[in-house]
C-alpha cells in the first residue's frame, strides 16, 4: 500500500500523528500489507488548512487532494517553511527508521507538479533537500522518488541517480510502458511501478500486470476503494450529474467491498500467487 502523509497534520499534533501511523501499520501488517509512505507532493490543490476538509465535488477527480508543501514553499517564505519540513521529515524517519512494516520511503511524489499549476524544475532544490534529510537519518528502508514526466530532465536525472530503488509512474498502455521499462533498466537497480492502471487510458490489470511480473517489477496501482477522492472519475473529465462513470478510471472495490470487476480481481489473484 502507498500512503500519503502531510506535514500540516504532523505540525498540528505530532505525537497523535505518529500514533495513528503506527495504528495504521499494525492494521495493515495484520493483513500482510506492507507500506510505502510518501512525504512531499506537487499534485492538485496548492492551498490547504487543518481541520475539517471541503466536501468532495461530485464527479470530480481528486477535488480535495492537497499538495505538500504547495504554496507555503513556492509562493511563501522558504526560510519559514523549510525548517518545519526538515523537522517533520526527520521526525517521521527517525521514529520509523527500522520498522519492517515499511518497505520504502517515497520522498517526493511527482516533483514538478501535475493537476493544475506546475512548478516544473523549480522543484529541484526541495527535492535535493529532502534526499539530504533522508540520507542524514539513514533509515534501514530504501529511499526513492518516482520519475513520471520525461520532459523534466534535471529532476529525472537527480531522482534516478539518487533513488535506492527506481520507482516510476505511467498510465500508458503496454507498448509505451515497456519502452519506459527498457529505458529505466539501464540503472541496474530494483524497480517498482508505484502508479499505473487507468482503464480509459488502456492501462489495465490484465494488460500491464503480466508485463510487470515478467520484468520482475513491483506493481502498485492507483486506488483501492471508491470513496471521497472520486478517482473512479478521470482527470479533467468532471461528471457531476452521474453516480459513476460508464468505465471506472481507477479503484478496485466499491464502498461495500464488492469488486468493480470480478475478472480483474481474479487476474490480480492469479498473478500474485
Per-region residue spans from a language model:
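Active-site mouth of glycoside hydrolases
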Residues: 1-163, 169-176, 187, 196, ...
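Conserved catalytic-core segment of NTP-binding enzymes
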Residues: 180
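Conserved active-site loop/cleft motifs that coordinate metal ions or position small ligands
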Residues: 192-195, 218-223
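Structured C-terminal subdomain patch of bacterial secreted/periplasmic proteins
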Residues: 229-239
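Catalytic domains of carbohydrate-active enzymes that cleave complex glycans
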Residues: 270-273
Amino acid at each position: 500500500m502507498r500512503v500519503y502523509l502531510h506535514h500540516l497534520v504532523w505540525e498540528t499534533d505530532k505525537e497523535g500523528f505518529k500514533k495513528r501511523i503506527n495504528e495504521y501499520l499494525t492494521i495493515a501488517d495484520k493483513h500482510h500489507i506492507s507500506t510505502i509512505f510518501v512525504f512531499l507532493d506537487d499534485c492538485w490543490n496548492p492551498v490547504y488548512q487543518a481541520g475539517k476538509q471541503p466536501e468532495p465535488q461530485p464527479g470530480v477527480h481528486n477535488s480535495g487532494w492537497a499538495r505538500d508543501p504547495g504554496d507555503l514553499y513556492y509562493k511563501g517564505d522558504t526560510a519559514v517553511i523549510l525548517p518545519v519540513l526538515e523537522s517533520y521529515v526527520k521526525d517521521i524517519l527517525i521514529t520509523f527508521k527500522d520498522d519492517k512494516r515499511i518497505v520504502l520511503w517515497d520522498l517526493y511524489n511527482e516533483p514538478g507538479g501535475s493537476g493544475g499549476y506546475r512548478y516544473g524544475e523549480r522543484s529541484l532544490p526541495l527535492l535535493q533537500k529532502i534526499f539530504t534529510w533522508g540520507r542524514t537519518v539513514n533509515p534501514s528502508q530504501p529511499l526513492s522518488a518516482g520519475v513520471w514526466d520525461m520532459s523534466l530532465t534535471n529532476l529525472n536525472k537527480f531522482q534516478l541517480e539518487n533513488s535506492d530503488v527506481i520507482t516510476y509512474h505511467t498510465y500508458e498502455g503496454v507498448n509505451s510502458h515497456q519502452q519506459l521499462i527498457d529505458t529505466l533498466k539501464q540503472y541496474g537497480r530494483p524497480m517498482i511501478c508505484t502508479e499505473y492502471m487507468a482503464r480509459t487510458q488502456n492501462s489495465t490489470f490484465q494488460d500491464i500486470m503480466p508485463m510487470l511480473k515478467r520484468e520482475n517489477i513491483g506493481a502498485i496501482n492507483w486506488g483501492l476503494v471508491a470513496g471521497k477522492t472520486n478517482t473512479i472519475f478521470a482527470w479533467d473529465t468532471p461528471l457531476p450529474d452521474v453516480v459513476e462513470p460508464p468505465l471506472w478510471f481507477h479503484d478496485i472495490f466499491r464502498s461495500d467491498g464488492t469488486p468493480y470487476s470480478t475478472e480483474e480481481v481474479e487476474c490480480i489473484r492469479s498473478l500474485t500467487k
